[in-house]
């Protein structure tokens, strides 16, 4: 005699195989262009400085131009390929996992930017080195920072180093998504 499926059985049959976390800056949002437009320096040039120098230039440029940190983050452009990637992962109900700055306005600006994503509200804020706290079996992180991906993988998750939307989408397809 065949067993009648319970609600739990039905849920197990339809629940998603993976949980997807997607970074914002450098994946969906063009932080590099925004930084260069703000500071007149490329992020690769600014990265050659120490971390404090990078962010001091950012903060000083905001003050000089009269731009709030909220406005900076809320108004960033899409990363090239960002909309394509978002449209691909959207059916899987992804979470945004992004690093805030020390200024609380960055959280509010990023939260408002995320509203472009069809009212999506699933957003987590973690410094890059703590993103792996959310890692685990069947949890995917799409991020453009190799060190973050390495920590994610070491914590048991599946990290996808984002270099372009087509490359990331291909890696997701290899996972059956």
Outline where the language-model segments fall.
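Charge-dense, intrinsically disordered terminal/linker segments
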Residues: 1-18, 27, 45, 78, ...
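Active-site neighborhood of HAD-like aspartate-dependent phosphohydrolases
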Residues: 11-65, 154, 164
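Short, acidic loop-to-helix structural element flanking the phosphoryl-transfer center
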Residues: 67-96, 103-108
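Short, structured coil segments at secondary-structure junctions
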Residues: 90, 119, 155-156
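Short amphipathic alpha-helix with an adjacent loop that forms part of the alpha/beta core around
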Residues: 132-135, 171-177
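Acidic, Mg2+-coordinating phosphoryl-transfer loop and its flanking beta/alpha structural elements
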Residues: 140-174
